[in-house]
Each structure stands twice: as C-alpha cells, then as structure tokens.
Amino acid sequence: MNSILSDLVKVIGMERDALLTYASYRLGNRSDAEDVLQDCYLRLHERFTDGQEGAKLNIRNYVFRSLSNLCTDRLADRTRHLTVDLGQQDVVETDTDNRESEYYRITSMLDRIPEEQAEVIRLRMYGNRSFAEISNILQVPLPTVKSRFLYGIEKIRKAMKPRA
C-alpha cells in the first residue's frame, strides 16, 4: 500500500463521523450521506491506487473537498429528478419530528444565504473544520473564508429576528 493510500485510510478512520455529519446536513438525510461518503471513499481509493499521487496533497482537506463536490452533484441530480409525495399523512409530533423540524429550519436558513457563505458555515459547524482547513478545502484565502462565515451568520441572525 502506498503512503498516500495509507494516509487516506487513517484520515477516513479518524474523520468518518465528521464527514458523515457534514454530508447529512448537506443532503438532508443520513442514508444519502452514507451513500455519498461510500462513493467518495471508492473514488479516492481508485484514484490513489492508480498511482495518481500528489506530493504536497493534504489528504484531510482533499477528502472534505471531494465529499463536498459529490454532495453538490447529488443535490443537482435531485433537482433534476424532483418528486412530490402526495400521500403524506398528518402524524403526532415526536422528538424525532422535533429534530427534523430543527434540521429543516437550519437548512432553510442556509438556503437563503449565498452558497459560498453556507458552505463555509457547514464546514465550520458540521464538519468541525478550522478556518485554515476550510481555506485549504475551498482553495480560497483565509480572510475570504472568515468574511463569508461572518456575513453568512449575520444574514441568518437578521432572518431569525422577529419583525416589529
């Protein structure tokens, strides 16, 4: 096993929960997140076993960036194949429903701000990434990452304030 592949295995082992949480918030459900995460692992494994190595590659950031790209692709596929469930029934709200309601509220707020800002917030809050790591993942300057986070949070706060 080459060194980059062994590094990939270590990163996947250490970051699995953070990657799954991040993908779950991007995609809206754990099942799709697990599928995308598995696809990401397989693609990266194939890439690195084919001898495509990068001497100065930061594996952790590369994995997050690859996962982010696959989530974006999955979301784009969803909008092309959007279906509507006409058989929904009203049910009594449970704790799971409360968590789902909170999830949809957060997702709705993130959908109202520019994608660049929402992506930084997701990586910071659900991916547990530092601003420096996010800068590397998104390949943008550190001050840009910080300003996107700040402006995104400010827009969310304004949206949450009750209107007088």
Which residue stretches match the model-derived regions?
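A short pre-motif secondary-structure segment
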Residues: 120-124
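Internal acidic/polar
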Residues: 80-110
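Sigma70-family region 2
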Residues: 2, 39-58, 77-78
